[in-house]
Amino acid sequence: MAEKITSRAQDYSQWYIDIVRFAKLADYSDVRGCMVIRPNGYAIWEKMQAALDRMFKETGHVNAYFPLFIPESFIQKEAEHIEGFAPECAVVTHGGGEELQEKLYVRPTSETIIWSSYKKWIQSYRDLPILINQWANVVRWEMRTRLFLRTTEFLWQEGHTAHATETEAKEEVLRMIEVYRHFAEEYMAIPVIVGMKTESEKFAGAHETFCIEAMMQDGKALQAGTSHHLGQNFAKAFDCKFQTKDGSLEYVWASSWGVSTRLIGALIMAHSDDKGLVLPPKLASRQAVIVPILKGDKAAVLEKAVELEKMLKAAGVQVFLDDSEQNTPGWKFAEYELQGIPVRIELGPRDVAAGKCVVARRDTSEKETLEIDTAFPQKIKDLLDSIQTGLFERALRFREEKTKVVTTYEELKAQVEVGFAVAHWDGTPETEAKIKEETKATIRCLPVSKDFATKYGINTEGKCVFSGNPSKQMVVFAKAY
């Protein structure tokens, strides 16, 4: 029940854990660092999968599946890649009761195993581009774990594409980060900053990494998706060449991009409150619940409740009727608030007699009485749209309130305690590392979002907030998950 939840003001970390557990989204596993995604949590992931998969296919991608196990020799082919992932890898040394001749790495990411196949599939420019996505699980041996945000095993999608030119590969990288931005803002109702990672923060083995960064309610950043320009690194590692139109041989250009179940963590931390989970309707598997108040003429109330359920389902609303009598209506109200059901419809004997019902919205807790007529389903759909829009606008207002341009190092140190600091940086890894060491804040990205860049004057010259050296562009500093 909702009263068990620790308040955000009291302990934000415990509040998050309480919501994950009490809303029955996930639970701890007996396997260290792993989690059990419960039906309520998996239903959100299925909604995310469906929306993203549709967008991937609309942009020309197809799904495939590659092995979970990767030979050690494959991992070692790309030096930067293995250096970046080796500490996180789980390694299989025995199988069938015997020591393996070659160790097998449990997939931390799939570039190497996929490019071993691409080498076989690509001979000519006619074989390009290859636009493949994979839905899979990956394993990274995390030392400090938190449900959804950082676990040893997690679910994700990873896109891997092969192209004839660098221009095409770069276009793919930017196309897919835009897909992620659209998904975050239109489905998750979370405003994000699109940007490029610094050299020290980019993906191991990439030329460039683009990202979307979101702000959580404690002012910290969460990287919600990445898209990598891999250049020809993996093609060279696997000697993957193609014959061009003029007959010459060239290495293939590549991209990779991915999001994971940490998006569920982002969803929780961006919107939820001290009563429990708050879900944007587009990602809620149950958008509305009908709670009949079964006293007086129970039969009439139930009959009208069933009629309402049919009306709403026919209109495409994902609604369910809770006509159980084990729990009181008040218990149900609190429970469905905790579970984040966007709309609650209350129906009692007086409502039935008046031809009306009470409708409560989860995001603001506002209630209104609506006529039960032919327009009722559309009113509920409009309400769901209003909740979706309202959540985004509220999150955007919050981010803007917690984002500040700073011109001194003292200002930066104070600002990263509450939100995002936009500041000039001299472009050196030494300055970046020193700021991280002293403040625990990292450069989240070099923003490329036009609206954000314009609002905060990103592309202006100035002096580095730390060193005082010349700076060509401002960046976003924040503490992060």
Curated annotation (Swiss-Prot):
Top-rank lineage group of the source organism: Bacteria
**Family matches, as InterPro entries:** aa-tRNA-synt_IIb (IPR002314), aa-tRNA-synth_II (IPR006195), aa-tRNA-synth_II/BPL/LPL (IPR045864), Anticodon-bd (IPR004154), Anticodon-bd_dom_sf (IPR036621), Pro-tRNA-ligase_IIa (IPR002316), Pro-tRNA-ligase_IIa_arc-type (IPR004499), Pro-tRNA_ligase_II_C (IPR016061)
Q: What class of enzyme is it?
A: ligase
Provide the disulphide bond pattern.
none
Keyword Ligase set for record: yes
Q: Which Pfam families match?
A: HGTP_anticodon, ProRS-C_1, tRNA-synt_2b
Chief location: cytoplasm
* Subcellular localization(s) per the UniProt record: Cytoplasm
Name the chain's protein: Proline--tRNA ligase
Species, as recorded: Chloroherpeton thalassium (strain ATCC 35110 / GB-78)
Q: What is the lineage of its organism?
A: Bacteria, Pseudomonadati, Chlorobiota, Chlorobiia, Chlorobiales
Q: Gene name on record?
A: proS
